[in-house]
């Protein structure tokens, strides 16, 4: 592990996670380069702010489920290479039904340099503490469509309210939202704003 980084569950005790890119359940359809274990890594500063967010969410009856944190540069390169491949339709319906995979970059869903590689970005959602069920957000994680935008039309009032709740929790815990993805937040005062790391998650 790089100095300054930690497994988030070692700091944010009791947090739930499902490291999608370590599994077959992601838009590439297979585990992604650089993810060798199903755990989530981030900077210590990210972990401390997430702990604050977890505590704030709990006062409202919610918990945090994490999908991705630190992302090795090799994983980003894997995304870029995948986006350049001919369409095979294996994941299109589930993740990008209304665009071509070649448009993922131009539309802002995939970037050649990711804030995740700096170690202080997080992808997450809320779940109800009383039932353990994920709250409805109007689209799935990594759904590359306008429906995933914070200002999306066509989602229910409850889904919009849930997005606002997550955003309020995160912004009050030191994070900034990304307008195109309701699940993506970056630490406002990140410790390595100009560094992109490539050590594997293991």
Swiss-Prot record:
It comes from Enterococcus faecium. PANTHER family: D-ALANYL-D-ALANINE DIPEPTIDASE (PTHR43126:SF1). Keywords: Antibiotic resistance, Cell wall biogenesis/degradation, Dipeptidase, Hydrolase, Metal-binding, Metalloprotease, Plasmid, Protease, Zinc. It catalyses: D-alanyl-D-alanine + H2O = 2 D-alanine. Zn(2+) binds at residues 116, 123, 184. Its EC number is 3.4.13.22. Disulfide bonds: none annotated. Inhibited by aminoalkyl phosphinate analogs. One of its GO terms (biological process) is proteolysis. The lineage of its organism: Bacteria, Bacillati, Bacillota, Bacilli, Lactobacillales. The keyword Zinc applies. Binds 1 zinc ion per subunit. Can also be activated by other divalent cations such as iron, cobalt, or nickel. Induction: By vancomycin, mediated by VanS/VanR. Its cofactor is Zn(2+); Fe(2+); Co(2+); Ni(2+). Belongs to the peptidase M15D family. Optimum pH is 7-9. HAMAP family: A_A_dipeptidase. Pfam families: Peptidase_M15 (PF01427). The active site is at residue 181. The record marks 71 as: Transition state stabilizer. Gene3D superfamilies: 3.30.1380.10. This is D-alanyl-D-alanine dipeptidase. Does not hydrolyze D-Ala-D-lactate, which remains intact for subsequent incorporation into peptidoglycan precursors. Production of precursors ending in D-Ala-D-lactate instead of D-Ala-D-Ala decreases affinity of vancomycin for the peptidoglycan chain and leads to vancomycin resistance. It comes from the Bacteria.
């Amino acid at each position: 592990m790089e100095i300054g980084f930690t497994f988030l569950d070692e700091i944010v005790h009791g947090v739930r996670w499902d490291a999608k890119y370590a599994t077959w359940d992601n838009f590439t359809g297979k585990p992604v380069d650089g993810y060798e274990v199903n755990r989530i890594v981030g900077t210590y500063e990210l972990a401390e702010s997430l702990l604050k967010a977890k505590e704030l969410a709990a006062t409202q009856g919610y918990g945090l489920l994490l999908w991705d944190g630190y992302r090795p540069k090799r994983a980003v390169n894997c995304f870029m290479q995948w986006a350049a491949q001919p369409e095979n339709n294996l994941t299109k319906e589930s993740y990008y039904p209304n665009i071509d995979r070649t448009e993922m970059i131009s539309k802002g869903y995939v970037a050649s340099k990711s804030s995740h590689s700096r170690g202080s970005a997080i992808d997450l959602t809320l779940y109800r503490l009383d039932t353990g069920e994920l709250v409805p957000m109007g689209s799935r994680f990594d759904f590359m469509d306008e429906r995933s935008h914070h200002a999306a039309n066509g989602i229910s009032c409850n889904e919009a309210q849930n997005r606002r709740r997550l955003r309020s929790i995160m912004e009050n815990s030191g994070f900034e939202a990304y307008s195109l993805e309701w699940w993506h937040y970056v630490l406002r005062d990140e410790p390595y704003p100009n560094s992109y790391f490539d050590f594997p998650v293991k």
